[in-house]
């Protein structure tokens, strides 16, 4: 029985799930918007939001903890140099999930997940895609 077990399995084993969310978190931090399935977007929010909260206090220990969770130096640098100061006054709710229809082929519900206060230039690039 799976009583009180949180998180979605997404038809993957635990190491695959961990690697997938590591990669998706790095992509979201670098591009500030990504398109994925709705359940993955909802789970990714649980990974990315604590990372941004961690980046609000720039210390060596927090940088090492963020690196342990993402395994990407560029992601850690952007988190602490750009996103931490940008979201310093916001107490959570750093991401937004926008539904965008269904995928051709398997009819999976798709969604954009984006950072809330991203620059408008990036918004124009996303609509061009």
Curated annotation (Swiss-Prot):
<dbReference type="InterPro" id="IPR047859">
    <property type="entry name" value="Ribosomal_bL17_CS"/>
</dbReference>
<dbReference type="GO" id="GO:0006412">
    <property type="term" value="P:translation"/>
</dbReference>
<dbReference type="InterPro" id="IPR000456">
    <property type="entry name" value="Ribosomal_bL17"/>
</dbReference>
<dbReference type="GO" id="GO:0022625">
    <property type="term" value="C:cytosolic large ribosomal subunit"/>
</dbReference>
<protein>
    <recommendedName>
        <fullName>Large ribosomal subunit protein bL17</fullName>
    </recommendedName>
</protein>
<keyword id="KW-0689">Ribosomal protein</keyword>
<keyword id="KW-0687">Ribonucleoprotein</keyword>
<comment type="similarity">
    <text>Belongs to the bacterial ribosomal protein bL17 family.</text>
</comment>
<comment type="subunit">
    <text>Part of the 50S ribosomal subunit. Contacts protein L32.</text>
</comment>
<dbReference type="Pfam" id="PF01196">
    <property type="entry name" value="Ribosomal_L17"/>
</dbReference>
<dbReference type="GO" id="GO:0003735">
    <property type="term" value="F:structural constituent of ribosome"/>
</dbReference>
<dbReference type="InterPro" id="IPR036373">
    <property type="entry name" value="Ribosomal_bL17_sf"/>
</dbReference>
